[in-house]
Amino acid sequence: MVVFDLLGEEVDFRPGQYFWVTLLDPPYDDEKGPRRHITVVTSPTERGVLGLATRLRDSAFKRSLAELPEGTEVEVEQPKGSFALPQETDRQYVFIAGGIGITVFRSMLRYIADEGLPYRITLVHSNRDRESTAFYDELRGLEAANPNLEIVYTMTQDPGWEGETRRIDADMLRDHLGDLDTHTYLIAGPPGMVEGVTGTLEEAGIPEDQIRSQGFSGY
């Protein structure tokens, strides 16, 4: 996780939005350049900072991020994006995350906890194994403190995991949620995972206006 100090500036954003970040003097560069859009993992209630979390990959941008010395300045543009925490609190929400797609939901759930908002949410988070699961302990803590939050973890390649191990599809969701029609779904993760989960929900008869999604590609 990388945290940027806003140096006293106030930046207003909705949980789930993203920012364009430009590395001003990166140690590595490639044809994609030093500018990327990144979903913020911190909440608007965490004033004065913007945090991002990503899987480390062998791209110039990520290698540069990993090696930035403390105090390095970067350029952060104004927030964008419509994949944000819905304003309606009277619905039953299902947040579905694949891997590092959890970042967007960490921002939302942290905000809900800090503001004491009455959302009813089931978070379904799919990972390869427990070791690679981001924010596991923190999110379990939020779940323990909020009776309106339930978390379902599925570890698809972890022999030692004693919980759910299936990939996310309509049958798996139905086993944990019951009637799928009564929920509104927010889906974030790798594009293939997002497409697959969206497709299985549509095949189960869930209307388009109850499904919102955002893919996270490598950068």
Predicted regions and their residues:
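Ferredoxin-reductase
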Residues: M1-T72, N127-D129, T156-Q157
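FNR/FR-type flavoprotein reductase catalytic core
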Residues: G48, R57-Y219
